[in-house]
Amino acid sequence: MSCPRENRERAEELLVCSRGVLARSSAGRLRPEPECELRTCFQRDIDRIIHCKSFRRLKHKTQVFLQPEGDHYRTRLTHTLEVARIARTISRALMLNEDLTEAIALGHDLGHTPFGHAGERALNDIFPGGFRHYEQSLRVVDRLEKDGRGLNLCNETRIGILNHTTGIPRGSLEADVVRLSDRIAYINHDLDDAERAGILAPGDEPEIIRERLGVRNSERINSIVTDVIETSAELDVILMSPDITEAVQVFTDFMYAEVYKNPVAKGEESKVGNILYSIWECYVNHPEKLPADYRAIADEEGIERAATDYVSGMTDKYVMDVYYDLFIPKSWQVR
């Protein structure tokens, strides 16, 4: 009698086209391990990512706006979930491997810093050799999670996590789906958040966006997703049509000009570099202040690497707690 995993693998042979990746044909893991009887290898990757500490910490990491007051702004976690849903929809329609797509999407931002891209820019300036969140995401799943053992994900998932950023050599079509879904998600939900914050008003976006993509968030996402599916249906690459590509590029340029570089939205970012550098430098000069796991990394790979790993994994709130603990005098009472 076959097990549930084998049944699912047989189903994939019917549901996944020749352009997709079959779980049964996976290149395997860094460390071989027995198969699960219930789940395919990519389904196990999904579960490992969702249950890891780095994934949970995304709920307290900035998406765009630093320390927003309000319950409905996106965080790095809600962004990740939106990317995963968009990517899975596209993958299903194109008969690619939905589970691999979802695993890549859920893991793609695990290495993101506190304070969003402002934090990434700060660590890129601080750490010798530079800091890139997609490389750190791979390091999280390979080296930092599970007390240094890593999650031991499938190679297809690992490569997809590394390759989710524009300009990085492609891996699978599933990885390409995540790469585009990431962009679809962030330009749309960041516009929604910018309107909520009063930085933009409804209708401020260029006319080409409203004409070709739609007015509401759901309309824009549906227009782009539908176009990607129709354009990519018979291709070995994931693309948008020329008309939608033009509109999305105008959309992206508009967001960079009016939101991502807006002095109101970015007014507090100048403080981020000083805070992160102060914490990082303190750990470099005082390795004994690092947790034991990171002191072990310092022994193997150097204190600068260990300090970067630790600081990049912090949430926005924890960074401030650490900063106050390290640098702000504590109140005391004379008895």
Predicted features and spans:
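Conserved short loop/turn motifs at secondary-structure junctions
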Residues: 106-107, 124-125, 296
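Short active-site segment of divalent metal-dependent hydrolases/proteases
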Residues: 111-115, 185
